[in-house]
Amino acid sequence: MIELVRITPTAMSLFDRIADEVFDEPIRPDCVSAYVVEPGHLMILAVDAGLVVGQCAAVIHRHPDKVTELYIDELGTAATHRRQGIARRMIDAMFEWGRELGCKESWLGTELDNVAANALYRAIDGRRDTMAYYELEL
């Protein structure tokens, strides 16, 4: 059975066993340590017998003039565990956590050609919008 775990500083050992394709890059312990203690940074891991097979990362986005939002930053599932409803369970759990923390809306982005992601977001009544995306060096 897949267990969903809200990540806190006490759950760091879960990052020792991660299936391929759950994260975009190899885990950096210094980044994980900084992430889990940062207020407003949330992560849920899907764990199968001690192996991380999915992750959903989000950030609380506060505005001076709008409701508090939950930005879904990453959602990934190991290829071996796709099409089992894990991504849907993780995003539903993240929405619940966001509501507990006062979020009223959520938003995210995905590639236009990511068929699986677009299907998931339509299934949870996501409203597709248009926007331009830019990456800038700092």
Please state what every model-predicted region is.
Residues 61-72, 82, 129-130:
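A conserved beta-turn-beta hairpin within the catalytic core of GNAT-like acetyltransferases
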Residues 77, 83-96, 119-123:
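Conserved acetyl-CoA-binding loop-helix of GNAT-fold acetyltransferases
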